[in-house]
């Protein structure tokens, strides 16, 4: 039964079962209540009567009242009283009576007076006739009455809580166990002590001019708030400056006034009280007098001895009562020697260490000891602190400290300040909410040891060295002083900087955060530090190191992070800041601020940097190409914060394992020319390691410093780079590497064989004219034995490549150009190399390289185009555009021939001659180069395709696929061929009239070979997706990256290739890759059904389907050019697709520089091609000639916009051209016929905004399919100031969205090549910091290397990849992808917007021509890149591109302001932590 009872009670079995007695009581109660109800049911009483009878009942005490009941009843009444608003005299009296009773004080009421009294004092409250308050006086036994304004104020405002506190404070003074005559002296003694302390404080206040903080630290008694009414005197001795008041998060407590500090809830303070104790002699008169020191002239306090006149023996002591209990060290506490400390100093429980107490106190008892790691989540990184307990540091929790003389107060306050500093520093590592991450890889592990009370040591692994680093916090002088100890460096300046930070924030995590940032910066310097401002950029300070904005950090929003020191130890840039500081605000998830910095440079650069790092090359050598490369951000400048060595090692191993046959390296040695070039600055110290391979030596540096990016146009003579194979090992392999450095600025990154790093190429934008950047450096080694064999065959065959070297000047056509550029380009061709344009695009003009015929066995000849082309009457030089074969129309070849004046064709008229645009160095527009597999060398003008061998021209940004090489002959070649070649080849094939199966096969082969590498590079792979196999190619072999494969991507000419390019580019770490990406697809646009294969990156827009290959690229600036070149290279399939509307597609070269066949470009002129499919069979290219101005800048802009618009006849208004870097203005090219400007373009031109902006107006997928604009949108934030989206183009970038992975992350990579006009032109491009070139980065590039590479199989679903890379993107992409079926449906417009930036199109195993989405981002890049290339002198910031609604861009910057999990506003944190 009891069981059922329990159940019925509803609370379950645990419930209490009532006893018999309880039941009886209950029944009695109910009976009584029933009686009461019956009694009053007939004659109801008023409430007053009931109240009276109840009261009478209690008074009569019919039975002994349980005191507990009485207390409960009383407290209930008092609570009620508390909620009654006092509006009348009666209410006031009742409330005061209630308060007095609660405090045990007597309350008396007179007509106008109320008294609240105790034995020792009474409070007199005067009311006026109306019953309102007029005055309050406090009478102490031994003193005359004191009028108390505080008490008046709180009663008038109805603040009875404060009134209560004050009454308590007054009565607490007398809580002594003594007779009244002694007791009454207590207040006198307390006042005497307060007077003395106030005198000491006034002494400090006089000589002090400064803020509340310096006063608080310098004053021996802290900040003193005198007694107010019943509130005791308060000394504020510590307040961490970082804490933000709740009200205004933008105002740090460091800006508080003295009063605010004293009233702040964050401050640590102590009040002076009197407590009962054993007998002590306490002063009853002030004992401090100020005496002027004869020697110093300063006033010094002197303390009078206590004697019978000024003191009294009483059972009391003064105490400093702390507002928050504080863990202190027992040893130090005992050393104070205070009277009566024994009770305080002997902790009740077992002895415990200070660290344990600190952890418990700081976590509010949530964490009991130091056994586990303490996680601290900062904006983009997580730290895990392990406290190492020091058994010697026994501690105790102190809440009050006794003292008896004023002289002891300064000692106690000094002790408290020190303990507070120690406590605050260690407690900064403790969070109440411990979020643990499974992902320990991305967490910085630190060990914190309290060596003593004056020293805290934090140990962590140096992110870039295999060693431990130690940060010591010395607390000797009451201020933290930091020292950093490391194996390799004596960080004196860094230690000073950290000391300033530590004093500002008093937080270990923030100091470590800053330290890691500084190491990141330092690492940047080591890697790319040499890259002084970058040739294009100007004086050393200004050029962005990555070509980005001002390096010095001064102009950046986050300049605080830049190094303050004038020059870092390694002598690199003065500012020491990251060029990219602007990007700091990147999306919070992206790994760390540092990474963000990095991000600002071009992603490609970053990757390149990463890869360079991996190669074990001397970090500087990569950049050595020098500063000039600013553009080079690519080189490594990328502020890419290369990831830590972990990654580097991983990749190193990969390379070691997979590429046994890569034996050569390229060493690049800049030989400073006229001292002006920035390059000379950083590089001089670089040691070149000579290893087999190619050595690239710039003979004189370029002077165009002021030009900002525009080296080419500047009067300075461009430097040439000579590439000589150092070892005879496999010349063919290396030969491809020539780097035509158009401008001295060319930064060639040192390449490791495996890394054909074009990296610098994209960045080179900075170097003004398209420095060849590293572009040329594609690694030569082939990735497979097959290739070797093939090459051998080629070499042996009778028709080897000519050995003769044409210098530009000698070559017939070239004379004019060469002279114009004033640079000589020499081309050394190794026997195997296919006719490569010698291209050093010296000045703007330089771009035109000499071309030589390709060897007969070269794939070129076999390509379909080739066959017809050679006969085609139209191409006098035998060049054919990729389309050539099928079409009867003038094709690239004709364009080229037209360009002859501008271009130099080889005397033999070999087909490969490319019409390299000579215009701005970008000229590499080799677009024309017909069959040859040329890659456009770096932007430089090399147009001629290099042999298929493993040249990863991709890298060269020009890698434009322009050369259309059919892969047919060499399947592997595509892989090995530089990616660009391969891509071009495929493109060529496609254009040929359909892709020949062979080409597909080749692509596949390339893919395969590359795949192995891919795995290692998986991260790059994100890009890949590209349609079909193409995407994979990238990693292939020596970094040839399978660009070719990419191109191959689809029989249909699917744009997939583009993504492949990207991969490869990534692989190379080149910006170029990025470019290709861009191109690849953007325009690819589904609209054009199968035929299009666009590979070229820069001109992504050019993708128009029918358009045949207009590849001309006129890269303006190297950096930009690189990206652009790829784009220009795009090759469209010629076959008209029935479905596709013939659209005029304008391929403007991004550089605009490429010459088109039809016209002759004046030396500097850049041209754009307009392709109109006039008939189904062929396209007609119309070339607009631009003014002869040499400015390289012009071309680029247009290219982006010109993108092809499938539908719009007018083709996008074309890009605006920028005013040449020289400043001469170019005509605007709209891509329409010469006379015509299509509306938007023409308007845009005026803006001279970076190309990125030019296209901004269009939607990504316009009907026209013009991808050009995308770029602008992507480029996202406008120029310099904003944080450009670094990510912008690359969708994929895996910028660590996830947990912060510190060092390795390359988050920074994402940004574009930034190399662009280093500071000068801050194109909107992603590289924010750098010139727009960053845009060129392909998404893949941006992906951060640190992520484990996802593995890609052909079949990997695109969305999966996207998910990996960026969930946001994936979401926006999904609809878009659905729209693209193998059937090439044109996605509805509504769907199109979203796809904008996805990196890769699905990869479909079949070669079907699915357009590769990847392209999209690329297109963006293209324009951007081009713009970067041109750094125009005027460098107007581009107009920020309009952001179309669902562009899918990753706008990292958007999250910048969000508060971190710690609740610290990130901006504020940055400003406080930074200098």
Swiss-Prot record:
It comes from the Eukaryota. One of its GO terms (cellular component) is mediator complex. Residues 621-641, 711-729, 738-782, 919-934, 954-966, 973-989, 1143-1159, 1185-1225, 1265-1276, 1334-1346, 1399-1409 have a biased composition (Low complexity). Component of the Mediator complex. Keywords: Activator, Nucleus, Phosphoprotein, Transcription, Transcription regulation. Signal peptide: none annotated. The modification Phosphoserine is found at residues 830, 834, 854, 858. GO terms for molecular function: transcription coregulator activity. The keyword Glycoprotein does not apply. Residues 1-10, 860-874, 888-897, 1286-1296, 1415-1430, 1442-1458 have a biased composition (Polar residues). It is found in: Nucleus. This is Mediator of RNA polymerase II transcription subunit 1. The keyword Nucleus applies. Residues 1-26, 616-644, 709-992, 1135-1166, 1184-1245, 1263-1354, 1387-1475 are annotated as: Disordered.
């Amino acid at each position: 039964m009891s069981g059922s009872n329990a159940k019925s009670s509803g609370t379950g079995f645990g419930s209490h079962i009532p006893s018999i007695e309880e039941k009886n009581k209950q029944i009695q109660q109910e009976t009584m209540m029933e009686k009461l109800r019956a009694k009053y049911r007939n004659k109801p009483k008023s409430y007053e009567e009931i109240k009276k009878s109840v009261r009478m009942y209690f008074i009569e005490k019919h039975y002994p009242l349980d005191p507990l009941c009485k207390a409960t009843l009383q407290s209930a009444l008092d609570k009620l009283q508390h909620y009654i608003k006092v509006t009348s005299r009666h209410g006031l009296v009742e409330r005061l009576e209630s308060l007095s009773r609660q405090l045990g004080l007597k309350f008396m009421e007179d007509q106008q007076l109320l008294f609240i009294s105790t034995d020792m004092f009474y409070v007199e409250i005067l009311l006026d006739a109306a019953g309102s308050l007029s005055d309050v006086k406090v009478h102490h036994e031994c003193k005359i009455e004191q009028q108390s304004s505080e008490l008046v104020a709180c009663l008038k405002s109805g603040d009875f809580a404060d009134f209560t506190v004050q009454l308590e404070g007054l009565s607490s003074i007398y809580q002594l166990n003594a007779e009244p005559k002694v007791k009454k002296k207590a207040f006198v003694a307390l006042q005497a002590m307060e007077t003395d302390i106030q005198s000491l404080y006034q002494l400090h206040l006089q000589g002090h001019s400064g803020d509340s903080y310096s006063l608080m630290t310098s004053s021996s008694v802290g900040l003193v708030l005198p007694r107010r009414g019943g509130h005791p005197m308060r000394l504020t001795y510590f307040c961490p400056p970082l804490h933000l008041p709740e009200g205004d998060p933008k105002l740090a407590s460091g800006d508080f006034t003295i009063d605010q500090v004293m009233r702040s809830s964050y401050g640590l303070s102590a009040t002076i009280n009197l407590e009962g104790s054993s007998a002590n002699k306490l002063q009853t008169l002030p004992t401090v007098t100020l005496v002027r020191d004869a020697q110093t002239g300063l006033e010094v306090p002197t303390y009078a001895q206590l004697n019978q006149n000024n003191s009294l023996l009483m059972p009391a002591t003064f105490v400093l009562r702390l507002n928050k209990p504080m863990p202190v060290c027992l040893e130090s506490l005992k050393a104070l020697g205070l009277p009566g400390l024994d009770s305080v100093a002997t902790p009740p429980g077992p002895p415990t260490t200070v660290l344990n107490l600190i952890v418990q106190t700081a976590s509010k008892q949530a964490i009991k000891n130091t056994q586990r790691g303490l996680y601290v989540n900062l904006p983009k990184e997580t730290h895990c602190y392990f406290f190492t307990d020091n058994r010697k540091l026994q501690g105790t929790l102190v809440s009050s400290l006794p003292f008896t003389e004023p002289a002891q107060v300064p000692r106690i306050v000094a002790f408290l300040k020190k303990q507070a500093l120690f406590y605050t520093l260690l407690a900064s590592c403790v969070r109440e909410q411990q979020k643990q991450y499974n992902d320990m890889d991305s967490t910085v592990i630190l060990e914190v040891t309290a060596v003593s009370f004056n020293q805290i040591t934090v140990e962590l692994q140096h992110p870039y060295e295999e060693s431990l680093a130690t940060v010591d916090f010395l607390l000797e002088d009451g201020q933290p002083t930091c020292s950093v100890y490391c194996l390799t460096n004596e960080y004196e300046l860094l230690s000073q900087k950290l000391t300033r930070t530590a004093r500002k924030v008093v937080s270990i995590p923030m100091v470590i955060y800053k330290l890691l940032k500084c190491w990141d910066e330092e690492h940047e310097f080591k890697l790319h530090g040499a890259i002084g401002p970058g040739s294009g950029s100007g004086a050393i300070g200004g050029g962005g190191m990555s070509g980005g904005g001002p390096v010095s950090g001064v102009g950046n929003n986050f300049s605080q992070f830049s190094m303050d020191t004038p020059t870092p130890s390694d002598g690199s840039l003065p500012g020491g800041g990251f060029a990219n500081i602007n990007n700091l605000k990147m999306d919070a998830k992206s790994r760390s601020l540092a990474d963000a910095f990095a991000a600002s440079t071009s992603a490609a650069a970053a990757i390149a940097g990463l890869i360079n790092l991996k190669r074990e090359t001397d970090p500087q050598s990569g950049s050595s190409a020098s500063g000039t490369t600013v553009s080079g951000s690519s080189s490594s400048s990328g502020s890419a914060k290369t990831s830590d060595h972990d990654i580097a090692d991983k990749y190193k191993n990969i390379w070691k394992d997979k590429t046994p046959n890569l034996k050569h390296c390229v060493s690049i040695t800049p030989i400073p020319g006229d001292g002006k070039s920035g390059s000379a600055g950083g590089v001089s110290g670089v040691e070149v390691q000579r290893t087999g391979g190619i050595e690239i030596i710039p003979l004189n540096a370029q002077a165009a410093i002021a030009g900002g990016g525009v080296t080419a146009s500047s009067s300075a003579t461009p430097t040439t780079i000579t590439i000589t194979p150092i070892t005879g090992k496999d010349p063919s392999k290396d030969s491809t590497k020539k780097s035509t450095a158009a401008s001295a600025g060319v930064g060639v990154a040192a390449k490791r064989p495996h890394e054909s790093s074009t990296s610098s190429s994209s960045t080179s934008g900075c170097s003004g004219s398209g420095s060849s950047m590293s572009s040329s450096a594609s690694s030569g080694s082939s990735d497979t034995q097959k290739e070797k064999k093939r090459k051998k065959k080629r070499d042996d065959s009778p028709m080897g490549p000519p050995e003769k070297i044409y210098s530009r000047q000698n070559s017939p056509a070239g004379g004019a150009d060469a002279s114009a550029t004033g640079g000589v380009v020499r081309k050394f061709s190794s026997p195997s190399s296919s006719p490569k344009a010698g291209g050093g695009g010296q000045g703007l003009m330089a771009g035109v390289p000499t071309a030589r015929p390709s060897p007969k066995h070269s794939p070129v000849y076999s390509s379909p185009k080739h066959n017809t082309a050679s006969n085609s009457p139209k191409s006098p030089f035998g060049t054919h555009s990729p389309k050539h074969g099928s079409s009867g129309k003038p094709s690239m070849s004709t364009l080229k021939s037209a360009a002859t004046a501008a271009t130099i064709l080889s005397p033999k008229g070999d087909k490969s001659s490319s019409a390299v645009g000579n215009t701005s160095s970008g000229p590499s527009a080799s677009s024309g180069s017909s069959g040859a597999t040329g890659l456009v060398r770096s932007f430089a003008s090399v147009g001629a395709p290099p042999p298929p061998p493993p040249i990863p021209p991709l890298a060269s940004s020009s890698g434009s696929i322009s050369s259309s090489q059919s892969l047919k002959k060499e399947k592997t070649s595509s892989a090995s061929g530089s990616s660009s070649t391969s891509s071009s080849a495929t493109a060529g094939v496609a254009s040929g009239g359909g892709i020949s199966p062979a080409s597909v096969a080749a692509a596949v082969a390339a893919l395969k070979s590359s795949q192995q590498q891919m795995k290692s590079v998986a991260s790059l792979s994100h890009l890949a997706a590209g349609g079909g196999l193409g995407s994979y190619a990238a990693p292939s072999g020596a970094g040839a990256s399978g660009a070719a494969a990419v191109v191959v991507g689809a029989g249909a000419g699917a744009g997939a290739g583009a993504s492949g390019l990207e991969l490869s580019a990534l692989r190379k770490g080149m910006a170029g890759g990025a470019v290709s990406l861009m191109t690849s697809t953007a325009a690819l646009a589904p609209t054009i059904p199968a035929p299009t294969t666009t590979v070229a990156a820069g001109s992504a827009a050019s993708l128009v389907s029918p358009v045949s290959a207009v590849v001309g690229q006129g890269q303006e600036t190297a950096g930009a050019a690189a990206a652009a070149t790829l784009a220009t290279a795009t090759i469209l399939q010629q076959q008209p697709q029935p479905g596709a509307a013939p659209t005029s597609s304008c391929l403007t070269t991004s550089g605009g520089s490429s010459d088109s066949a039809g016209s002759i470009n004046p030396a500097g002129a850049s041209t754009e091609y307009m392709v109109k499919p006039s008939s189904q069979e062929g396209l007609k290219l119309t070339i607009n000639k631009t003014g002869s101005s040499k400015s390289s800048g012009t071309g680029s802009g247009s290219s982006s916009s010109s993108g092809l618009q499938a539908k719009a006849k007018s083709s996008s208004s074309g890009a605006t051209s920028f005013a040449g870097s020289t400043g001469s203005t170019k005509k605007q090219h709209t891509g329409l016929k010469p006379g015509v400007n299509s509306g938007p373009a023409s308007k845009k031109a005026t803006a001279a905004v970076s190309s990125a902006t030019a296209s901004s107006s269009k939607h990504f997928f316009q009907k026209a399919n013009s991808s050009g604009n995308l770029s602008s949108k992507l480029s996202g934030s406008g120029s310099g100031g904003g944080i450009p989206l670094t990510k912008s183009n690359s969708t994929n970038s895996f910028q660590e969205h996830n947990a912060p992975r510190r060092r390795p992350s390359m988050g920074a990579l994402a940004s574009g090549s930034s190399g662009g006009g280093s500071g000068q032109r801050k194109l909107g491009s992603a590289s924010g910091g750098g010139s727009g070139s960053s845009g060129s980065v392909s998404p893949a590039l941006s992906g951060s290397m640190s992520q484990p590479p996802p593995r890609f199989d052909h079949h990997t679903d695109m969305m999966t990849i996207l998910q990996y890379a960026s969930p946001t993107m994936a979401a926006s992409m999904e609809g878009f992808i659905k729209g693209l079926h193998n059937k090439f449906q044109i996605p509805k417009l509504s769907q199109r917007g979203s796809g904008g930036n996805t990196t890769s199109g699905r990869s479909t195993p079949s070669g079907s021509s699915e357009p590769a989405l990847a392209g999209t981002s690329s297109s963006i890049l293209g324009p951007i890149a081009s713009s970067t290339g041109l750094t125009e002198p005027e460098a107007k910031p581009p107009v920020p591109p309009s952001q179309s609604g669902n562009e899918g861009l990753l706008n990292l910057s958007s999250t910048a302001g969000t508060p971190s999990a710690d609740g610290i506003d990130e901006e504020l944190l940055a400003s406080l932590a930074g200098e």
